[in-house]
Amino acid sequence: MVNFEGVKGLENCKWEQRNANGPVHDMPRYDVSIPYLRMLPGPLDYTPGAMLNATRDHFFGNNNHPMNQGTRVHQMAMYTIFETPLQMLSDAPHKYRRNQECTDFIAKVPTVFDETVVLDGKVGEYIIMAKKAEGVWYVAGNADDF
């Protein structure tokens, strides 16, 4: 077993509905809850890496041009924070070609780590993690403050 599903991944943003207050679901808050709750039993399959990002005020579900709530940096941090030995990409290849810095980061960040330390955090608000792979530490943080 490499990854377990059981996560509301980014594909759900394609059909995300809005109400008077914005999107029905707060994906950045969800993203900073997963490490504390869903990752306890083991690796997950989330598919981060959305290249079209928006604030809650500007986000809307769209099958043809899917977007995500939050920032691109939020998306990149999930590649380190989430335990996912078989990592995936959530967007179209041409979007990664247009965002070479992100593509290079995704290609270089390990998917398996030797050591993990939660440096600080609060469920549903933020998380800061350090992970070590082959003697190199990777530090990432995410928050629900978009």
In which residue ranges do the predicted regions lie?
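Active-site proximal loops enriched in glycine and acidic residues that flank catalytic Cys/His/Asp
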Residues: M1, P48, A92-P93, G141-A143
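Aromatic- and carboxylate-enriched substrate-binding clefts and catalytic-loop regions
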Residues: M1-H65
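Solvent-exposed, flexible loop/coil residues
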Residues: G6, P48-A50, T55-R56, A92, ...
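Residues embedded in well-ordered secondary-structure elements
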Residues: P35, G70, L119, I128-A130
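Charge-patterned, long linear interaction tracts outside catalytic cores
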Residues: Y46-D91
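Flexible loop/turn segments at secondary-structure boundaries
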Residues: N53-T55, M88-S90, R97-N99, W137, ...
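Catalytic cores of secreted or luminal carbohydrate-active enzymes
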Residues: V73, A77-L119
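Carbohydrate-binding surface patches
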Residues: V123-F146
